[in-house]
Regions:
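Ribosome-associated RNA-binding proteins
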Residues: 1-178
Length: 178
């Protein structure tokens, strides 16, 4: 069990129950899954998709799936069935391991980092943020990066409101800017 998972079970749940918002430990919101997505413009180079797949596998510890376009969009030069990105969904132990590395190792490596934007919530308790450079993750070898792809990180919680989700993520160690 990762340190973040233990911290959640022992400290975060107790603090949220003591705050008076929840009467039962099972009512406390929890992180359900983390979705990592890399959108890739692979029109010109075919190896960009495989490179993105390898980097996302290195970062997440799980093999990502290739996402294909559902419809053709002429303005974007996208045809139906073309690979447009890679995605991986983390749950359970891998999710907590990733979040621990993300909060403690990756986010502080962002240049001029002052905390994550608190406006990234969707109204239903999920938080999404974009990462412009995959080199912030310690697992990625800098000399092997050919393309700076970036990614979207979505943290899905069981919270009903954004305030509950923000409180949960703040107690887990996510550094929000003020």
């Amino acid at each position: 069990m990762s340190q973040l998972h233990e911290h959640y079970k022992k400290t975060v749940v107790e603090e949220l129950v003591k705050s008076g918002k929840y009467t039962n430990r099972m009512q406390v919101p929890r992180v359900e899954k983390v979705v990592l997505n890399m959108g890739v413009n692979s029109k010109h180079e075919k190896d960009v998709i495989t490179e993105a797949q390898q980097e996302l596998a290195t970062i997440s510890g799980q093999r990502p799936i290739i996402r294909h376009a559902k419809k053709s969009i002429a303005n974007f030069h996208v045809r139906e069935g073309m690979p447009v990105g890679v995605k991986v969904t983390l749950r359970g132990q891998r999710m907590f391991d990733f979040l621990e590395r993300f909060f403690n190792a990756a986010l502080p490596r962002i240049r001029d980092f002052r905390g994550v934007n608190p406006r990234g919530f969707d109204g239903r308790g999920s938080y999404t943020m974009g990462v412009r450079d995959q080199a912030i993750f310690p697992e990625v070898e800098l000399d092997k990066i050919k393309h700076n792809l970036g990614m979207d990180v979505t943290i899905v919680t069981s919270a009903n409101t954004d305030a509950e989700a923000k409180e949960l993520l703040k107690l887990l160690g996510m550094p929000f800017s003020s």
